[in-house]
A protein has these predicted regions:
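Short beta-strand/loop element within the Bergerat-fold HATPase_c
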Residues: 54-66
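Short helix N-cap motif at coil->helix boundaries in the Bergerat
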Residues: 78-89
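Short alpha-helical Gxxx[C/S/T] motif in the catalytic ATP-binding
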Residues: 84, 103, 108, 112
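Conserved catalytic submotifs in the C-terminal HATPase_c
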Residues: 17-27
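Short helix-loop "hinge" at the ATP-lid/N-box region of the Bergerat-fold HATPase_c
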Residues: 47-48
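Acidic ATP/Mg2+-coordinating residue in the GHKL
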Residues: 74
Length: 144
């Protein structure tokens, strides 16, 4: 997971800072590492894309006997209450974006949900307009 953070490209005009907390004794994931890396990469890219010029991203990983919890939080534009469930649907794009020119076709979070659920996990979202978004992924031990 740390490799995904290090490989993140910062777009021109953005200042991105990361805060990460990975448990030192966390075992390697036995879930599909490519898919797990793609999920994290997608969440990071969304945090950057849907934030202003100064982006703060917090990534926290917790591990216990039940599995792994991965949380990605940002200080971005946030998601309106009526759109929080819709953002996980294919091709859905928020109508509350301050910049309608943000690229994308609305597949990222549907992909995240699909991969997480294929690993028998869950994904949840907390967000307020203007206050950022927190997405939490839970993967059970059986999927690891």
């Amino acid at each position: 997971m740390e490799k995904v953070v290090r490989r993140t490209n910062t777009p021109a005009g953005k200042k991105v800072s990361f805060s990460t907390a990975f448990p030192p004794d966390m075992p390697d994931l036995t879930a599909d590492p490519v898919h797990v890396a793609n999920v994290l990469s997608n969440l990071i890219e969304n945090a950057i894309k849907y934030s202003g010029e100064e982006v703060n991203i917090d990534i926290v990983v917790l591990w216990n006997q039940q599995g792994v919890e991965l949380t990605v939080s940002d200080n971005g534009f946030g998601i309106a209450p009526d759109e929080r469930r819709k953002v996980f649907e294919k091709f859905y794009r928020s109508s509350h974006l301050p910049d309608k020119q943000i690229p994308g076709i609305g597949l990222g979070l549907s992909y995240v949900r699909q991969i997480v659920e294929a690993h028998h996990g869950s994904v949840s979202l907390r967000s307020e307009l203007g206050e950022g978004t927190r997405i939490t992924i839970n993967l059970p031990t059986a999927a690891l």
